[in-house]
């Protein structure tokens, strides 16, 4: 995983199962929520191997007979005031054709106080998944880190967006020329997803986050565009705390 700067983090989501889309009178906010709901309605998927049997958005980019590969990704990014930015997360590639999964756990640190050639460091630990269990494929001597990897849970396994249509008064942005779009909503600390994140991560702030839904490409679906979701707790030049998650169906190699 490559977290270079705050604005360059792209966690991808594909538009999932098809259904009735928007009507001409739908607002852009409604269209954005419906576009994301096609994938987010699948949350939670407790057993990730269920994705082998789940369809996603496919277009001409997929070869005939290719069922596609699900890309699952979650990461927590924390930058305390005056310190370096650290990202810890995992990405899996779940091939629906071969029903096999590989990926890696990543720890990345970015320290803008250092010289350019020393500013960024990243360590990747390759993994595979069998019977819904994450298994490191190389020896890890650090037992604490090994357990962190083996017990890692993706947001898609416990998050829920069943009430996304009820989110209101979002900060909406839409550029038809690109096209790019986003919707940002203020959440409370008693929000289900916020509570679940706080259970699993040591989030060093009591501030309630904002939920950001952001994407590019055709709102009705595109395999070349992107969609990302983020829970942004703090975002400024000196301090950043946010969580990113993605679920994307891409053509298999």
UniProtKB/Swiss-Prot annotation:
Keyword field contains Oxidoreductase: no
Entry keywords, A to Z: Cell membrane, Lipoprotein, Membrane, Palmitate, Signal
Which subcellular locations apply to this protein?
Answer: Cell membrane
Q: Lipidation annotated as S-diacylglycerol cysteine: which positions?
A: 17
Query: Which segments cross the bilayer?
Result: none
Signal peptide stretch: 1-16
Q: Which PROSITE patterns match?
A: PROKAR_LIPOPROTEIN
Membrane topology, as annotated, equals: Lipid-anchor
Keyword Signal belongs to the record = yes
Coiled coil (residue ranges): none
Query: This chain belongs to which protein, by name?
Result: Uncharacterized lipoprotein SA0399
Q: Which organism is it from?
A: Staphylococcus aureus (strain N315)
């Amino acid at each position: 995983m490559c977290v270079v700067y705050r604005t360059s983090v792209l966690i991808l989501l594909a538009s999932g199962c098809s259904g009735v889309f928007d009507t001409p009178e739908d607002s852009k906010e409604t269209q954005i929520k419906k576009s994301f709901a096609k994938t987010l309605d699948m949350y939670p998927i407790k057993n990730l191997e269920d994705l082998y049997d789940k369809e996603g958005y496919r277009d001409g980019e997929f070869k005939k007979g290719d069922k596609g590969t699900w890309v699952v990704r979650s990461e927590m990014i924390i930058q305390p005031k005056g310190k370096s930015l650290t990202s810890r997360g995992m990405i899996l590639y779940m091939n629906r054709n071969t029903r096999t999964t590989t990926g890696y756990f990543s720890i990345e640190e970015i320290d803008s106080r250092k010289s350019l050639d020393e500013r960024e460091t990243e360590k990747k630990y390759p993994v595979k998944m069998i019977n819904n269990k994450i298994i490191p494929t190389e020896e890890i001597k650090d037992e604490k880190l090994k357990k962190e990897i083996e017990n890692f849970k993706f947001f898609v396994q416990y998050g829920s967006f069943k009430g996304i249509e009820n989110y209101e008064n979002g900060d909406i942005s839409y550029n038809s020329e690109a096209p790019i779009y986003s919707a940002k909503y203020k959440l409370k600390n008693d929000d289900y997803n916020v509570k679940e994140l706080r259970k699993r991560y040591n989030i060093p702030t009591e501030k309630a986050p904002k939920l950001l839904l952001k994407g590019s490409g055709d709102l009705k679906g595109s395999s070349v565009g992107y969609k990302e979701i983020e829970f942004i707790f703090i975002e400024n030049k000196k301090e950043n705390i946010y969580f990113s998650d993605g679920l994307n169906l891409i053509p298999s190699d």
